[in-house]
Structure formats: structure tokens, C-alpha cells
Amino acid sequence: GSSEEALLARLALRSMKQAKYTTECMGHFGLAANYYTHFTSPIRRYPDLQIHRIIKENLHGGLTKKRIAHYEKILPEVAIWTSSRERLADEAERETDKAKKVQFMERHIGEEFTGVISGISNYGFYVELPNTVEGMVRLANLDGDYYVFDEEHYELVGERTRKKFKLGQTVKIQVVSVDRYLKTIDFLPVRNFDKR
């Protein structure tokens, strides 16, 4: 339930290999099952429809050698095509979410919020708010010190002040700008606030 727990869950999910449809029996890691297929009901995706058809055909005794050969011929291409379509759909969903979050935060420019540092790089850090909006604090916009990215400890450290911005750290920010075209939100930390 903590902000750190949510962050760790998201980072673990991001680090996992992206799922794809395949004709190979690979089991299910999370369920520790050697044999696995998935489908949703009601049917939401073409692979769900395809596996429903195959299971129904098998239950009714229609899965003959000829039909199995047919599926062995067409399903590898179906798996590749549907995996690529799903990646495109996921990307469209992410872009739509970003656009709506930018549009929402446009009304909150100048306001202050408390969030958690969700990502760090050599050019800044990301802060995620409790409402899942994520914005960037750019190092170029930070006054009073020069911050260096410590990749080993996943933190930014001020050369002069030794002030640190660490992954999972709670920070108070102010919304300074949004860009609808780039779908970005810029934050600045509010001074003298550090819960760690």
C-alpha cells in the first residue's frame, strides 16, 4: 500500500520481457504451470477468439490431423501479427493517457503537489503524483547546485550541497509547464522539502 511498494511493482513490471503470442508451449511463469493458454470472456482480442474456436473444435471431436496441420500452418503468422497489433494498441493507449494527463495538469500550473521520485537519469528525475500523473524535474531548471547522476546508487547528488534526489523519495513539487504537442509535464521541487 505504500508509495515505495507501488513504485517497486511498476519497476518490476517494466523490467519483465514484453508478452507476445506464440504457438510454442512455454507454460506460465507466474502460475508455475507447464501448460497454459489464456483467453478472456467476453472475447476482447482475436487470439481469444482463435483459442475459443480451437478448444470448441477439440471438444466436439473436430480437431483432426488435417485441422491440426492447418493450424500449424497459419498460427505462427497469426501470433506474430496479433502481437504486433497489441503493441501498437498499447502504445496508442499510453499516448492517449499522456495527452489526457497533460490536458488535466494544464489547469493546475502553479499548484503544489507531493509525489514520489519514479525515475532518475543524467538529465533529471521523474515524479509521480498519487493520481498517477508523472512529470519531469529537469536538472537544467534546478538552481543553486550542479547535480551529478550516481548511476550505481540511482540518485542525483548536488556537488556543492550534497543534497540527494533518490528513487522512491517523497518530494513536494510545483507544476511549472505542460506541452500538449510533446505531451510533457514539467515540475520544480519546492524548496526545503525532503521527507527522507
Each PLM stretch: what is its role?
Residues R191-R196:
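Short peripheral tails and domain-boundary helices/loops at the edges of structured domains
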Residues R162-L167:
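Divalent-cation-assisted or electrostatically stabilized phosphate/pyrophosphate-binding catalytic cores
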